[in-house]
Amino acid sequence: MSQGRRTNELGWHERMSETAEHGTGAANATASPSGAVPPSGATATAGTGDEPGFRYDARLAADIERRWQRRWADEGTFNSPNPVGPLAAGFDEVAGREPFYIMDMFPYPSGTGLHVGHPLGYIGTDVFARYLRMSGRHVLHPFGYDAFGLPAEQYAINTGQHPRTTTDANIANMRRQLSRLGLGHDTRREIATTDVGYYRWTQWIFEQIFDAWYDPQAGRARPIAELIAEFEAGTRSPAAGPAAGTTAVSVDAVRAANPTGLPWAELDRVTRRRVVDAHRLAYISEQLVNWCPGLGTVLANEEVTAEGRSDIGNYPVFRRPLRQWVLRITAYAERLVDDLDLVDWSDSIKQMQRNWIGPSDGAGVEFAVVPPSGSAGAAPGQRIEVYTTRPDTLAGATFLVLAPEHPQVDALVADAWPAGTPGAWRFPAGRGPAVGEAAEVAAEEVAAEEVGAAEVEAAAADPAWTPRAAVEAYRAFAARRSDRQRGEEVDRTGVFTGAYVRNPVGGGLLPVFLADYVLVGYGTGAIMAVPAHDSRDFSFARAFDLPIPAVLAPDEQWYAEHRVTPGAPPSAWPEAFGGEGAYLPGPAGTPVLAGLTKPDAIKTTVRWLEDGGHGRLARSYRLRDWLFSRQRYWGEPFPIVFDDDGLPYAVPDELLPVELPEMTDFRPTAMAEDDESDPVPPLARVADWASVTLDLGDGPKRYRRETNTMPQWAGSCWYHLRYLDPTNTERFVDETVERYWLAKPGAAAGDGGVDLYVGGVEHAVLHLLYARFWQKVLYDLGHVSSKEPFKRLFNQGYIQADAFTDARGMYVPAAEVKQTDDGRFTHHGAPVDRRSGKMGKSLKNSVSPDEMYERFGADTLRVYEMAMGPLDADRPWHTDDIVGSHRFLQRLWRAVVDEGSGTVAVSDEQLDAEATRVLHRTIITLAAEYAGLRFNTAVARLIELTNYVSKRYGQAATPRALAEPLVLMVAPLAPHIAEELWTRLGHSESVSRAAFPVGDPALAAESERTIPVQVNGKVRFTLQVPDGAAEPVIRELLTAHPDYARQTEGRTIKKTIIVPGRIVNIALG
């Protein structure tokens, strides 16, 4: 046996590997158990010094890895046949296996490529997929790229290239980096959301949503043609109101389309169409949006910083109304909550979804508007609806607050200030500019400043500063603040509209204010303010000198904690009382709540409101309809055209896809800080594309295309379906194929989805919510078999790394930082501060996987990332630690291959009882670890077994009965070296198609047992005894143990109690 086989285990960087050539061995070579002949094609070359010629190092690893990756690609090793269709070849071989569908959250193809943190989840899913294949499952594991969107377009603009060019290049680079990891994907199914053949079906799904409406009685989406049929038959009214069955539709939109409430037969063509459009799941509406003129587009809330600026470019963002495409996700709010019970997700992710949807039960209360005497504003008959979860506190309401963007504001505002209106109510408190200047001045001058009495008097005397001027100025001020800023606990700002409403409880008049702490996207965009019992209302009432009556009496403890005299009026309280106290007597003719519990008081008040026609029981959701328009180029074009009346029509299926036109200048029209002008999408500049002649059934006509594009979310809502059938040109997915992979045999109808979906927790809300919404629409319309897209969700952790900041607080490249002898860190000689953070380009602490491939090989990187900690936990990256994983693979290599000759070094020796027990115990444990996604402990068990082999057999050949199962168990984690060793052991088929070993519990049973020995109640040592040993045997072993003499020396042994197989108790005197 060559002395080179068991030499030192140093990594490549600890020696001069560049001075030696390394033989590799042929992939299909077979050696005799004696290892007398090197594999065919292997050439052992002279190393330097004692260095063996066949050491497993980075160069040998790279050769093995590339060779096996080519073979996998050539043989289609990881192709997963469908039951039917163009990808069905080979299905007969796997037809008896249970299908299992694994997905990764597909990446955005960044221009900077991958760092070692990106593949963490991809490696984990690959390990699991390989284990399942070896365990007899038919596994589908595809991959793709989420390539549309603002980041890709902005990167193209910054680099002066077309986004198609940069996106394709980025995908190619990412594909190269991932392929070096040896991920077992079915590459025939690779998709990118920017592929025309892909977004053709994204557009088709949008049309299904556009041509559907939500029937609240049926509790599902139905084709829009069925709604029209009901209108024509007279079984459903086209007028707004509860009787019309429009509870899942905006009543305001229906009322606007049919303001007089005429029956269907009396409506003209345009009005009929507008009524129908108001019911669609995809509709156009004026929405309050985050308008970023610097980027020329609308932004999602997640793309706006806390300071009210764009995350990309740091441009100012304004809140303003724009006509946008919107998807009616709110119709599915209840189902999106209820169906969380169908999925195997963590409780924390489910709660995040529930919180975002935000269901709450309460009451809808109507407040009748009472215009001031002599005012032309606030038309008679107007009502403001408020949603509240605390109708029991209505008696304490002293004012109403509307969001500045509330749709009723313009109709409410009075022409003149009511007599006696305080100056502080007339924003901007005594500093009113002329009406035309209001928007400009307000945002700069009105930051809730203290105003003197003289200024207030001057404001009251300024005839130009009318309620409408003040409201205009305040709305301009609020438009410059983000939702986050508006919700902060700061000095309250607001403006009086000049209008009042009547409180249904007690009949008192309540002034109506606008204030930015009320958001139009929550509830009805209007609140009844009960300042004694709500902190925000309390601070507003204090700021505007409004009454603060109490409805609930605090207990004695609250008074004591707040140092307030018991019974003191709320005006003397330091803050609102938000607890549950005793109800105080209310005005005559109002609900009697004294002595009731909170739930009973709420029920009593709701019944009282319903009886009087002032309100009703209601459920509200925090969830808002999904804003779906972007004024950018790099996105899916809408398959929509408009006629001369502005009515939208879906492009016929045969005209799909609507392709993005080529543009040389695709940049949006940037408008600096212009928050007034309407956006001009880039596609609107392509005149011959934006205007098109079509025959939509009534002869050729000229139509105008929709020139907005879809958001980046669109392509990721359904990619789990396209993976199943990516080459299908007739359907987005074949029905048989979809049911094979997603339906669960024997499960309830609609129960199914992707078996395992792995990705980061940052997508725990919106991506998952939007994908669930699209899935449910497709399910309702009969296009898919499962209600939920993802049956099981697993969130992997992040890889963190040291990051460094200089004296300016700016991050510097971590790779350029040096550590001094005294432990300090410097960058080009200047001291820097170290901190830990998520690896990424923003912290300049990325480590490229290309570097790790070159230094150690892909298998080493795979093993290290899985060994760092539990897959769902964050873990720190330390490049120096990866050498441990490399040494493990070196020991594995030496367990099979002689490093000196390159020949197989295994024997036909039978395993003794100990080796058998160790092997089967490892197999059983490892199978459980793989199945439970506990890959870090799987690595630990494999290291233990490999170390056992090294210690047990030393320079001797490893028994084949131990070497082969060891290689099989390593294969999911380190597939390249496993393939090489498996082939050298004489197997021609890929190790990926071999069966995972099966452990025998009987053979894994311990022949010895460790039992504790207690002395006077404390464990002092342990005793190894034969399994099943009787008391006399244990007593003999006990007295012979050296610790027994030490513990009992010079002491009287009162009693020795032996419980065989369990414990020994010694009582000393």
UniProtKB/Swiss-Prot annotation:
Keywords: Aminoacyl-tRNA synthetase, ATP-binding, Cytoplasm, Ligase, Nucleotide-binding, Protein biosynthesis. Belongs to the class-I aminoacyl-tRNA synthetase family. A motif ('HIGH' region) lies at residues 107-118. SUPFAM superfamilies: Anticodon-binding domain of a subclass of class I aminoacyl-tRNA synthetases, Nucleotidylyl transferase, ValRS/IleRS/LeuRS editing domain. The gene is leuS. The keyword tRNA processing does not apply. Its EC number is 6.1.1.4. ATP binds at residue 841. Transmembrane segments: none annotated. One of its GO terms (cellular component) is cytosol. It catalyses: tRNA(Leu) + L-leucine + ATP = L-leucyl-tRNA(Leu) + AMP + diphosphate. Disulfide bonds: none annotated. GO terms for molecular function: aminoacyl-tRNA deacylase activity; ATP binding; leucine-tRNA ligase activity. Residues 19-53, 823-846 are annotated as: Disordered. This is Leucine--tRNA ligase.
